[in-house]
Amino acid sequence: FDFIPTSDVISFKYVFGSEEYLEFVSSFNDVFGFFLSGPNPAGGNYVEENLAIIPGTINTPVSIFNVNNVSNSAYYIDNGDGFTAPQNTDPTVIQFDGFTTPLTATANVNCGDTYHIKIVVADAVDWVWDSGIFLEAGSFYSPTLAVSDNLGLDSSIMNITCNTQITLTANGGGLAANYQWFDSSLNLI
């Protein structure tokens, strides 16, 4: 799908699940990816850059081989066979024998440019045991810029989309007044 971000970052939450867990972790390696294409703010272009990577790694993809009860186990939930212990007792039980904890895919983007994301599930070698991805509803996020005037009793916050021109006018203070603008992280703009 194509999208146009409203800020300089995008993110969304997902869970990867598979019936390959745990019996086939070493035999078959079902994997998936969220592949981003479009302008890279650091220069050049993203060309099918995988956003589905294990947190804290540079480019290790989320797969049954890389996330399980031994590897990156902090991100793994054992669901047994889906019917017997230690299955997840949550009322939203699924048949997958294991799945990841909710993970977040994120990327730096150029506000206002067009991007493309391709979602791919690779059911490696066998077709008997399924794997799937669950996207959290409403989690695809590209925040708008918030500008706040907190200098007086009449404070306001303006949500500004990218490529929007605004004029800020400061009144008072006389000729000796010195104004500085900071972003939400208190960096001087």
Model feature map: region roles:
Residues 3-11, 112-114:
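Extended extracellular/luminal ectodomain segments enriched in beta-structured repeat modules
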Residues 8-10, 164-168:
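Structural beta-strand segments of beta-rich domains
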Residues 14-24:
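Short amphipathic, basic-aromatic surface patches that mediate peripheral association
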Residues 25-111:
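Exoplasmic/lumenal beta-rich domain surfaces
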Residues 111, 155-164:
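Short, solvent-exposed loop/linker segments at the N-terminal edge
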Residues 120-128:
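Short beta-strand-plus-loop segments that form exposed binding edges in beta-rich domains
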Residues 143-156:
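Proline-enriched interdomain boundary motifs that mark the N-terminal boundary
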Residues 167-189:
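Surface-exposed, flexible coil segments in extracellular/virion-facing regions
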